[in-house]
């Protein structure tokens, strides 16, 4: 019997990967003591390796927080510029109204 004559096994299709929302829901739903989110220092031989991994993890989260804060600051800057423009135009209108009142009283 040749290999072509053998019946091919049909494998099931691969499931779709989870959506970003599903991943975020899983991460946010995880408890703090989840083994994925903690560093285990019980093995002394891998202590330095784990410490390095924990430090990298800490730096990663600090970087993520920095990026988030930077994005929030950019949004705040845009909002403040818009409010500044509104206040500037209101101040100019107020000065015009004051000048008109001065002229009207004279």
Curated annotation (Swiss-Prot):
What is the protein name stated in its UniProt record?
UPF0449 protein C19orf25 homolog
Q: Where is the signal peptide?
A: none
Organism ancestry: Eukaryota, Metazoa, Chordata, Craniata, Vertebrata
- InterPro entries from the entry? UPF0449 (IPR028227)
* Native organism: Xenopus tropicalis
Which sequence ranges are marked TM in the entry? none
Superkingdom to which the source organism belongs = Eukaryota
Q: Which family does it belong to?
A: Belongs to the UPF0449 family.
